[in-house]
Amino acid sequence: MQITTIGLDLAKNVFQVHGVDATGQVVVRKSLRRAQMLPFFVKLPPCLVGIEACGTSHHWARELIKLGHEVRLMPPAYVKPYVKRGKTDAADAEAVCEAVTRPTMRFVPVKSPEQQAALSIHRTRDLLVKQRTQTINMIRGLLAEFGIDIPKGLERALLMARQIVDGKSPDVPIEAAKIVGTLSQQALDIHVRLREIDRDLAVWLRSNDVARRLMTIPGIGPVGATALAASVTDPHQFRSGRQFAAWLGLTPLQKSSGGKERLGRITKMGDKYLRKLLVVGMTALVRRARQNPEGDPRLADLLARKPTRVATVAMANKTARVIWAIMARGETYRTGHQPALAA
């Protein structure tokens, strides 16, 4: 009996394999150590390998593709319904093997090392931004206990902290001033690292054609363009711009039944980092439209009819569709083109 389909449950050191033949009969069910993984698959004829899209999955997918196997990654949430009972590595591998053969299953494209490297820059940048915010908020909270209110803005906060460290505020004890100095130096160090990361993203942007074309869209900056280009391996996996917007969680949640359509809030499913970047970018466009309604009359009209946040999400939905069109068709943004707003 020849193995045609394998379900592979990944882990750090011990991997579980569940293989079946063309009739669905179990041929192999075994665990492998990390060092045994590639030698095991080298001996097999080319077959279909299903893997949950989790940590290290893209690495192993690339390695197995080099050996001639067809590898398909699946979202873990879509594999879970095929687990019959209990939670074991063997049960998970069997569920993966069953799920990968379903004709309606949705798969995750395998990312290249370059894409994963770019995404690691974004993950690090997002972490450092959060840490910088936490540090500044810590300084604000500490000084508030001594009756000192720090103005908004990073530069103002660091300037005020420096004045306190230099002893220009006698109301702050020496011990507290030392802590403020430590925190302000940490915030400054993080800020310097963020500037370095932004320069790395600018270099990656110049070398990537897709990211450069996405930069032509209003509201999409270097961070958003590089994140989208690195996250979307194949735009043709989506049938339309609406499906791409749904993948980002920017479409209404449907609870329709009996022929009656019921739409709720946006689903907020998918990559929340990409969704956040889109919404933040559209927030800037909405703010500009409020200051200059003649610049975008249709957005100004939408703001007159809908709450600000609703209009912002509608713009993010519209922009997601434009992004898909540009990525799928290899075009750049046409300034005169005005697709319908999703209100």
Q: What do these predicted regions represent?
A:
Residues 1-343:
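A detector of single, family-specific signature residues
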